[in-house]
Design a protein with these regions (language model features):
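Short, internal acidic amphipathic alpha-helical interface segments
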Residues: 62-103
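Charge-rich, low-complexity N-terminal segments
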Residues: 1-51
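Amphipathic, Lys/Arg-enriched alpha-helical patches that create a basic surface
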Residues: 128-137
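Short, ordered beta-strand-loop transition motifs
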Residues: 25-33, 56, 97-101
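Short, aliphatic-rich beta-strand segments
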Residues: 104-108
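Long, continuous compositionally biased terminal/linker segments
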Residues: 39-69
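A short acidic/glycine-rich loop-to-helix N-cap element
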Residues: 112-128
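Short, highly charged C-terminal tails/helix-capping segments
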Residues: 141-148
Length: 148
């Protein structure tokens, strides 16, 4: 396990003591000692899967599944146009359609070395920046994707 995950585990333990079992942990077996924390972020009537990826690199990132149902190939050009606009307007995130499953994802990359890593920054970013942003744009994305 990596140093960032050790710090995140302490935060998760504190959250669990308070009754918040937001995250489950998955340890990977790779050269970067990757640990993925699975959670959910509520946006309107949707509970969006969230993956916080901590590894032995200069970055940490959060991936949010904007859709959990594959979008139709026919709407992908319109969706990509909408996502490109969002990518230009909101610099903190990157939206894309995965070629693996045709779902829409949002990645938020955070530079942070082991020594400076603060897990509360990750959680606060999700709750205070990403969640309000998704409240503003999620319905429009689903509409363009033909899922609303």
């Amino acid at each position: 396990m990596n140093k960032k995950a050790e710090k995140f585990d302490l935060l998760v333990a504190d959250l669990n003591k308070g009754g918040n079992t937001w995250f489950t942990k998955e340890e990977m077996t790779d050269d970067l000692n990757t640990v993925v924390y699975h959670g959910r972020l509520d946006v309107h009537e949707h509970s969006l899967p969230v993956f916080i990826v901590l590894e032995d690199s200069a970055f940490t990132y959060a991936r949010i599944a904007i859709t959990t149902t594959s979008i139709d190939e026919k709407v992908i050009p319109a969706v990509l146009k909408e996502l490109n606009t969002l990518n230009q307007d909101y610099k903190v995130s990157k939206y894309y359609v995965s070629v693996e499953d045709n779902n829409i994802y949002m990645d938020v990359s955070m530079p942070c070395l082991n020594e400076q890593f603060d897990p509360t920054v990750v959680v606060n970013l999700l709750l205070e920046v990403i969640q309000p942003h998704l409240y503003a744009v999620h319905k429009a994305i689903l509409k363009v994707a033909g899922l609303a």
